[in-house]
């Protein structure tokens, strides 16, 4: 699914006629049809982000989504999720946003998770406002805890 979405964003095609490839294409098309209409601008695809001296990762997209600068990530799942079940995804969005802010001097306002199941059930989770700021704070606390534990175990 991720490969199809990445190729779509880059204006390229991808053909995989295996059963898994056909399913991945259907899932990607669901995300494109239901999640991409609100994508107004793409800054980058498969963007490697890092917070100097602390961590690194790669997000699927950075851009403007529903009028806000956003970190956008695609997720495939076997069954639909409730918002309270995706805490780790929300923290991941916050981590990417903090890294983007630090390196590029931005103020990413929003995390967007576009999710699809194998039977093409689409879900969109948007984290912004105070909730997004809170997740940024929670992620920084986790980083502090990690480095404190690492220091104590040395």
Language-model region placement:
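Mg2+/Mn2+-dependent nuclease catalytic core
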Residues: 43-150
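Acidic, carboxylate-rich catalytic segments that either coordinate divalent cations
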Residues: 152-154
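Metal-dependent nuclease catalytic cores that hydrolyze phosphodiester bonds in DNA/RNA
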Residues: 1-56
């Amino acid at each position: 699914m991720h490969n199809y979405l990445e190729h779509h964003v880059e204006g390229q095609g991808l053909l995989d006629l295996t059963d898994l490839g056909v399913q991945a294409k259907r899932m990607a098309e669901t995300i494109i049809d239901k999640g991409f209409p609100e994508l107004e601008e793409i800054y980058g695809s498969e963007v490697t982000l890092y917070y100097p001296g602390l961590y690194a990762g790669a997000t699927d997209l950075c851009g403007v989504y529903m009028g806000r600068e956003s970190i956008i990530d695609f997720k495939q799942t076997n069954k639909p999720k409730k918002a309270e079940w995706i805490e780790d995804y929300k923290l991941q969005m916050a981590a990417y946003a903090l890294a983007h802010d630090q390196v590029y001097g931005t103020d990413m306002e929003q995390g967007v998770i576009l999710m699809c199941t194998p039977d093409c059930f689409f879900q969109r989770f948007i984290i912004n406002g105070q909730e997004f700021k809170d997740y940024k704070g929670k992620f920084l606390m986790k980083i502090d805890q990690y480095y404190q534990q690492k220091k104590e175990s040395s």
